[in-house]
Design a protein with these regions (language model features):
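Bacterial extracytoplasmic/cell-wall-associated proteins, especially those involved in peptidoglycan
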Residues: 5-116
């Protein structure tokens, strides 16, 4: 049985960053965790906030087993504090690089720009 927080975070990692590097996937997880801490909300509450993560109200458990397993592993590592990362320097948001405001950019990882 997978804990709800791990499932929600894994869904975000999968749907927002599959195809990105492992660092990019950890960075997406960091943003979710940063928001959870800052807003004193659960991981699932953060994921399902209106207009925050594209299509999150329609996300389903993926059929791509390898990418899904990696998403579960990353979510588990992050939430169980097995792996501590700080790729985003405390970023609260990310966007596709082509749509991101240049003046707020903290770091670019793959196709995403992370900012506060």
């Amino acid at each position: 049985v997978i804990k709800a927080s791990i499932l929600c975070l894994a869904l975000a990692i999968y749907h927002e960053s599959r195809g990105e590097s492992e660092n990019g996937q950890y960075a997406v997880a960091e943003v979710v965790v940063n928001r959870s801490i800052e807003r004193n909300k659960t991981i699932c509450d953060v994921i399902y906030e209106p207009r925050q993560f594209s299509g999150s109200n329609k996300w389903k458990i993926p059929k791509d087993n390898n990418q899904w397993k990696q998403s579960i592993n990353i979510a588990t590592n992050v939430l169980d504090n097995e792996v501590k990362t700080n790729y985003t320097n405390g970023s609260m948001y990310f966007r596709v690089a082509s749509l991101s405001p240049k003046n707020k950019q903290i770091i670019r990882i793959g196709n995403h720009v992370f900012y506060k």
